């Protein structure tokens, strides 16, 4: 297998540092930061109705979620290059502070506008944390080892996604919805303390003036990217709900959004330090894996948003019960990712795992087409396990080969681009299946629902909005109508899963374009960990271990 690790770029080669107490405490801080950033993507779901009623948000309720999604997607893309300019430690500290400030504002919100402002600030911090966590790991361990640590961070993310809705419901019911934001302060604070106290990484530009560094920021690219993503998210938020897909209010912002992204890509050839260097996309392996990250994330959100519709509308589950019924996906993704990371570290191979991952996802989505009222618990659980294992494998084995194909100087921008593509895929992971579902539901309602009143409730996005146990069960006194409604959901969802198979197939075929690179066992980076300053070493080791004679602070 050819070694493509040399790119003609001068890099500092080091043996990976010893993994003593300092290393593990820093990694703990990174894991905590990842957990708290992921928590805010899910904790609000069960509290949203209460928040909306308390603040009188009405039709603005969707933006309580979308402002966070928008700002985190943009910040995840731009913070990689900013960390090259201002240093990893400074940007990580700033990201945690921004996230904490946004959490405090959200928790103290007195109206919807204040909450939206807080959520936007939170997203800027949360998206930055997600990218910087991966970048810091890349600076701390060799490329060969990164899969294991990526798997552990993935486990932290999955844990947050699982416990988030439960925590949100618990706080809302027993304390106050405001504590779903306030709880972030001590968690982020503990991570911030460890980062500020322990993290020391090299910054090649530490002698450059702040003004000169500010001038190197890709201001034009950031503006175009923000406008493009905002327009697309605006269109997808309106599509099928506020306005039909055929409405100019949906089509125009969508077109403008794509034009904005095309303008961003064209502009990236101009600045000396672009947010997403075009050389990343000229590399076949990196470009392919960026697309695979988009598809993987799209499919994960596809499944996690549309299986609950099946559970509630077809299997008659409550919203809380449907969240529990998603546990087979949530609890297998992280372990599968960790195992894949360990095997990748031991063997240095990743392509075979990618084939296996996408094959399992394809099989699972094919099996989802069999779901109906008669599907047993064992069957839908097994289908989810296959999908969870596949997504865990694909997630963990995605970033290391990207970085293996690029010079170490592109670690931050390559990582940021990979995470941006994941986040961008998540945006489409609800929009595409919703469009498929609503189109099929409209056709079926016209063909199979005779009652014009009931038909009116199910067309134009109504079936998607009313996919609840309460709605379907309200027709118990009219068994024929209830059977027809359940049949509408089964057939519409079957088409959703059939379309997902096509995306899985594209992901599998893209695996053939990924080259085999050597995963370097040495740590080549300009941003690696510095030796600890003696004062900090004595202070922190004493604080943690109370003067133990066997300090392992390296």
UniProtKB/Swiss-Prot annotation:
| The keyword Transmembrane helix is assigned to this record | yes
Picking any one GO molecular function of the record gives: transmembrane transporter activity
An example of a Gene Ontology cellular component annotation for this protein is: plasma membrane
- The residue ranges crossing the membrane are 24-44, 60-80, 96-116, 123-143, 151-171, 179-199, 219-239, 251-271, 289-309, 324-344, 352-372, 385-405, 417-437, 496-516
Keywords from the UniProt entry: Glycoprotein, Membrane, Transmembrane, Transmembrane helix, Transport
Triggers of expression: Expression is positively regulated by the acurin A cluster-specific transcription regulator acrR.
Q: Return the PROSITE patterns for the record.
A: MFS
Could you tell me the superkingdom of the organism this chain comes from? Eukaryota
List of glycosylated residues: 174, 283
Null allele outcome, as annotated, is: Does not affect the production of acurin A.
Protein localization: Membrane
- Give the bilayer topology: Multi-pass membrane protein
Q: Which Gene3D superfamilies match?
A: MFS general substrate transporter like domains, Multidrug resistance protein D
The UniProt entry, under InterPro entries, shows: MFS, MFS_dom, MFS_trans_sf
Its main subcellular localisation, reduced to a broad class, is: membrane
Q: Do the record's keywords include Transport?
A: yes
Its family remark reads: Belongs to the major facilitator superfamily.
Q: What is the protein's known function?
A: MFS-type transporter that may have a role in the biosynthesis of acurin A, a highly reduced polyketide coupled to a serine via a peptide bond; either in extra- or intracellular transport.
Q: What is this protein called?
A: Acurin A biosynthesis cluster MFS-type transporter
- Organism (species): Aspergillus aculeatus (strain ATCC 16872 / CBS 172.66 / WB 5094)
């Amino acid at each position: 297998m050819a070694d493509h690790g040399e790119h003609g770029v001068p890099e500092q080669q080091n043996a990976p540092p010893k993994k003593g107490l300092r290393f593990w405490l820093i990694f703990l801080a990174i894991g905590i930061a990842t957990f708290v950033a992921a928590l805010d993507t899910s904790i609000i779901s069960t509290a949203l109705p209460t928040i909306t009623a308390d603040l009188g948000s009405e039709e603005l309720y969707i933006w309580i979620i979308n402002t966070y999604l928008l700002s985190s997607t943009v910040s995840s893309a731009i913070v990689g290059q900013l960390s090259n300019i201002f240093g990893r430690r400074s940007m990580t500290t700033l990201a945690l502070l921004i996230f904490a400030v946004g959490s405090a504002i959200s928790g103290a919100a007195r109206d919807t506008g204040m909450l939206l402002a807080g959520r936007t600030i939170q997203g800027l911090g949360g998206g930055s944390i997600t990218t910087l966590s991966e970048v810091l790991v890349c600076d701390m361990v060799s490329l060969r080892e990164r899969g294991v640590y990526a798997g552990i961070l993935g486990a932290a993310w999955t844990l947050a996604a699982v416990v988030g809705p439960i925590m949100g419901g618990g706080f809302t019911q027993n304390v106050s919805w405001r504590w779903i934001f306030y709880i972030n302060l001590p968690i982020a604070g503990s991570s911030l303390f460890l980062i500020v106290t322990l993290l020391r990484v090299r910054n090649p530009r530490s002698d450059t003036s702040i003004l000169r560094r500010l001038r190197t920021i890709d201001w034009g690219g950031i503006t175009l990217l923000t406008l493009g993503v905002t327009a697309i998210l605006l269109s997808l938020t309106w599509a099928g709900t506020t306005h039909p897909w055929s409405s100019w209010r949906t089509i125009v912002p969508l077109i403008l959004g794509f034009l904005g992204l095309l303008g961003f890509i064209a502009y990236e050839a101009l600045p000396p330090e672009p947010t997403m260097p075009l050389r990343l996309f000229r590399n076949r392996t990196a470009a392919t894996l960026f697309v695979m990250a988009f598809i993987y994330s799209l499919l994960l959100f596809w499944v996690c948003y549309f299986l609950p519709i099946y559970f509630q509308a077809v299997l008659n589950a409550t919203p809380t019960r449907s969240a529990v019924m998603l546990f087979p996906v949530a609890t297998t993704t992280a372990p599968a990712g960790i195992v894949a990371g360990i095997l990748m570290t031991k063997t240095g191979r990743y392509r075979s795992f990618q084939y296996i991952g996408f094959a399992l996802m394809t099989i699972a989505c094919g099996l989802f087409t069999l779901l109906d009222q008669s599907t047993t618990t064992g069957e839908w659980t097994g289908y989810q396990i296959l999908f969870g294992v596949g997504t865990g494998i694909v997630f963990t084995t995605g970033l290391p080969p990207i970085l293996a194909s690029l010079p170490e100087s592109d670690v931050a921008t390559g990582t940021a681009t990979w995470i941006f593509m994941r986040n961008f895929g998540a945006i489409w992971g609800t929009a595409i299946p919703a469009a498929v579902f609503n189109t099929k539901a409209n056709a079926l309602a016209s063909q199979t629902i005779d009652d014009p009143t009931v038909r009116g409730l199910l067309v134009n996005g109504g079936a998607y909005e009313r996919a609840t146990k309460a709605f379907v069960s309200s027709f118990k006194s009219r068994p024929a109508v209830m059977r027809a409604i359940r049949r509408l959901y089964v057939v519409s969802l079957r088409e959703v899963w059939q379309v997902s198979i096509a995306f899985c197939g594209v992901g599998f075929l893209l695996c053939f374009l990924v080259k085999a690179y050597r995963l370097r066992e040495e740590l080549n980076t300009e941003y690696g960990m510095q030796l600890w300053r003696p004062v900090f070493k004595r202070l922190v080791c004493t604080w943690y271990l109370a003067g133990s004679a066997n300090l392992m602070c390296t």
